[in-house]
């Protein structure tokens, strides 16, 4: 039995908080100080933790989320009371939906002032509870370490997400007693039970057209590696949701049907409609609504660390709950024969491969200006090699990128799908670069999404972050526009004015570029990639083919 831990006296609760953050292995915190939380910022000066001041609290959560997604360890946001916390909530809701581990510490008024009408008083626990895995206010100084420790456990374990801790000012500023808790390791799960794994192996053996649907958790590096080993021995037909980008490597590309989502009209969607067995790996319904892809005729298997969240269109016949990688290894040992594609599945995969080759050969020949989306995607494919991390904002461009730009490294591409939040790309890029400063990061947004977080260009310049941000410019919220046009045959609230993004970037101290002709696209991107530090490239885009995205688009219609 463990002995009681030695209780230490701390001059300030903030000192115990910071000590607990160090014990958790935190390397940096993102945030904006204020009177209710400034003692924690002061204590951080005497720690090993780097303070990254940001320009908006939501972006602190986005940056922390990128750290969490790439490392598996929760990133940390630190904000003051009232609007400091309310500004944070979009970032926390996004992290929770995307499965990104984030711990946010928010200042609060003194406990004695909670029921008074005082400056910045707000029930932040009630506000954060619906959009986090864990939301708690510390009510006694001797509970500081355990509350913070449990926030990290909640954020990192199971399906990761966000956690929020409210810190009243009197607890932060006043003396505290307590001891730092060691960072707990996630309990090591085993593989799913043998009987359930045997049932899935038998279902695979009996299936004529099995398919894997890879969700967010499938792209965790250890799970992705297990998939690669499994697929190398027993090739399968599979595809990934947008959230699972990078889960399939190049060696298995011949049986990869691409990414699915949004309009239910991709090669993977066609395979799903033909499948008699659908094996969902690391999938959550928030990633792709089951009603969009599950007709109810196929046997449904759920492989994840958590039981399925059931709904009318997602009731698995078999659930393999346990460590995903270990479960896949066990399942692979029970599959005795190579999986043979049906002629229909083989035709779908071959056609997808032909379309990829068509884009590779002819994409650069789309010479209109403003530029066709496929021309930009083709040029981006040349600069996004395996050493580059790509963060993608939300807008029409993200559909073109998700469908036609390929990546083969787990967590190489970050796409928002749970909330489809605009403005994530640049702060995500900053967080990703801080994790791997030796890697170039390319972020991409539309001109609408960019201005929702473009103030963080100053943060990127201050850090000398090696980031290239690409802006697809069309002076409108086009993804909304194409849907409005289809539904109502007219547009409302989707148009806005131009910005000189080259000058805008230079005003922050970044290098600014503007593509001014079709032939200038590739040279400009190469020049921007060569910049050591933040660079911004503005590319005018012609979205007139966007309505095709909602239909049965074949690239031969364009190329």
Curated annotation (Swiss-Prot):
Pathway where this protein functions: Polyol metabolism; (R,R)-butane-2,3-diol biosynthesis; (R,R)-butane-2,3-diol from pyruvate: step 1/3
One GO BP annotation of this record: isoleucine biosynthetic process
Catalytic reaction(s) noted: 2 pyruvate + H(+) = (2S)-2-acetolactate + CO2
EC number(s) on file: 2.2.1.6
Pfam families: TPP_enzyme_C, TPP_enzyme_M, TPP_enzyme_N
GO MF terms held by the record: acetolactate synthase activity; flavin adenine dinucleotide binding; magnesium ion binding; thiamine pyrophosphate binding
One annotated Gene Ontology cellular component of this protein: acetolactate synthase complex
Note in the entry: Does not seem to require thiamine pyrophosphate.
Subunit structure and binding partners: Homodimer.
The name this protein goes by in its record: Acetolactate synthase, catabolic
Keyword Nucleotidyltransferase belongs to the record: no
SUPFAM superfamilies: DHS-like NAD/FAD-binding domain, Thiamin diphosphate-binding fold (THDP-binding)
Gene3D superfamilies reported in the protein's UniProt record: 3.40.50.970, Single helix bin, TPP-binding domain
Keywords for the protein's UniProt record, in alphabetical order: FAD, Flavoprotein, Magnesium, Metal-binding, Thiamine pyrophosphate, Transferase
Binding site for FAD: 159, 263-284, 304-323
PROSITE patterns per the UniProt record, alphabetical: TPP_ENZYMES
Binding site for Mg(2+): 447
Family label: Belongs to the TPP enzyme family.
């Amino acid at each position: 039995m463990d002995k009681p831990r030695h209780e230490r006296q701390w001059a300030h609760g903030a000192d115990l908080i910071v000590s607990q953050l160090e014990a958790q292995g935190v390397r940096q915190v993102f945030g904006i100080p204020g009177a209710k939380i400034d003692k924690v910022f002061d204590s951080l000066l005497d720690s090993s933790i780097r303070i990254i001041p940001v320009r908006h609290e939501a972006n602190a959560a986005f940056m922390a989320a990128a750290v969490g997604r790439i490392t598996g360890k929760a990133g940390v946001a630190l904000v003051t009371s009232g609007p400091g916390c309310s500004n944070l909530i979009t970032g926390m809701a996004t992290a929770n939906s995307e499965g990104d581990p984030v711990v946010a510490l928010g200042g609060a008024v003194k406990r004695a002032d909670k029921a008074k009408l005082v400056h910045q008083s707000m029930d932040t626990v009630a506000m954060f509870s619906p959009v986090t895995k864990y939301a708690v206010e510390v009510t006694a100084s001797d509970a500081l370490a355990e509350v913070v420790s449990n926030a990290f456990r909640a954020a990192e374990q199971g399906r990761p997400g966000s956690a929020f801790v409210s810190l009243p000012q009197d607890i932060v500023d006043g003396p505290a007693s307590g001891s730092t808790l060691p960072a707990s390791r996630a309990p090591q799960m085993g593989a799913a039970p043998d009987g359930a794994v045997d049932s899935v192996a038998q279902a695979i053996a009996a299936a004529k057209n099995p398919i894997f649907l890879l969700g967010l958790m499938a792209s965790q590096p250890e799970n992705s590696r297990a998939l690669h080993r499994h697929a190398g021995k027993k090739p399968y037909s599979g595809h990934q949701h947008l959230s699972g980008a990078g889960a399939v490597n190049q060696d298995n590309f011949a049986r990869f049907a691409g990414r699915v989502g949004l309009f239910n009209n991709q090669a993977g969607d066609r395979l799903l409609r033909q499948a008699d067995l659908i094996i969902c790996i690391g999938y959550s319904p928030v990633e792709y609504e089951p009603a969009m892809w599950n007709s109810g005729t196929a046997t449904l298997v759920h492989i994840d660390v958590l039981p399925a969240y059931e709904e009318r269109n997602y009731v698995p016949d078999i659930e393999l709950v346990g460590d995903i990688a270990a479960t896949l290894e066990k399942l692979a040992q029970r599959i005795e024969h190579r999986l043979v594609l049906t002629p229909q599945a083989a035709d779908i995969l071959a056609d997808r491969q032909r379309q990829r080759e068509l884009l590779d050969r002819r994409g650069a020949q789309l010479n209109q200006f403003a530029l066709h989306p496929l021309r930009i995607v083709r040029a981006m494919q040349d600069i996004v090699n395996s050493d580059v991390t790509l963060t993608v904002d939300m807008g029409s461009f993200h559909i073109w990128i998700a469908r036609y730009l390929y990546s083969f490294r787990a967590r190489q591409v970050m796409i928002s799908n749970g909330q489809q939040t605009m403005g994530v790309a640049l702060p995500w890029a900053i967080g990703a670069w801080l994790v791997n400063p030796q890697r170039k990061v390319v972020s991409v947004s539309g001109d609408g999404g960019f201005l929702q977080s473009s103030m963080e260009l100053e943060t990127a310049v201050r850090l000398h972050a090696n980031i290239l941000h690409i802006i697809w410019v069309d002076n409108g919220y086009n993804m909304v526009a194409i849907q409005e046009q289809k539904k109502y045959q007219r547009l409302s609230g989707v148009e806005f004015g131009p910005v000189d993004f080259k000058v805008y970037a230079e005003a922050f101290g970044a290098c600014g570029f503007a593509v001014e002709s079709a032939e200038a696209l590739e040279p400009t991107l190469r020049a921007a990639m060569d910049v050591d530090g933040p660079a911004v490239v503005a590319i005018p885009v012609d979205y007139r083919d966007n309505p095709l995205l909602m239909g049965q688009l074949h690239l031969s219609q364009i190329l």
